Swiss-Prot record:
The protein, known as: Uracil phosphoribosyltransferase
Species this chain originates from: Paraburkholderia xenovorans (strain LB400)
A molecular function GO annotation: GTP binding
Activity regulation comment: Allosterically activated by GTP.
Cofactor binding, note field: Binds 1 Mg(2+) ion per subunit. The magnesium is bound as Mg-PRPP.
Annotated positions binding 5-phospho-alpha-D-ribose 1-diphosphate: 85, 110, 135-143, 206
Function: Catalyzes the conversion of uracil and 5-phospho-alpha-D-ribose 1-diphosphate (PRPP) to UMP and diphosphate.
Catalytic activity: UMP + diphosphate = 5-phospho-alpha-D-ribose 1-diphosphate + uracil
Amino acid sequence: MTQDSRFPNLFILDHPLIQHKLSHMRDRDTSTRTFRELLREITLLMGYEITRNLPMTTRRLTTPLVEIDAPVIAGKKLAIVPVLRAGIGMSDGLLELVPSARVGHIGVYRAEDHRPVEYLVRLPDLEDRVFILCDPMVATGYSAVHAVDVLKRRNVAGENILFLALVAAPEGVQVFQDAHPDVKLYVASLDSHLNEHAYIVPGLGDAGDRLFGTKN
């Protein structure tokens, strides 16, 4: 895991398996089926990385041989909240890692001026939870900021929110950091820039279209 000195709340997950799978996802010739499978796999790997600092405690239990104080995750429960629609493809990998997690959804689409338009919010109970927001792309950053706003408006503290994405543009990361400096943003790659259409370069295209086999 590395950081960029420009963005203190950004963490780049540079594990070789994550980078290998991301490279295959970038390839325009990768099929919809393979893209979908890779998204699940890479999200599972990234989820493993971002949960490594969850607080631990011990629980007394009995093995077939003896009683022990065994390490278990302490305290706050997890909730996975994909940002629709492309974020749906990331929830399976995270649920494979944490099958007991609750799942919510935040529906946002990007208007012609690139601003987010909210059309759906369905969340589990908010008390004493850590929320993992997931969306494959942080391009302009506006949708990511809006998703965090949805939780903060409901009194979820920034320290209890993690945002997980595959690729991000520096422009979007700056917008996110300015709006939510208390929320950690985890990505597999910080790409070069946004083009004139607000697409990430080099990026991987439209993640939703590639995930579902649709055309923009």
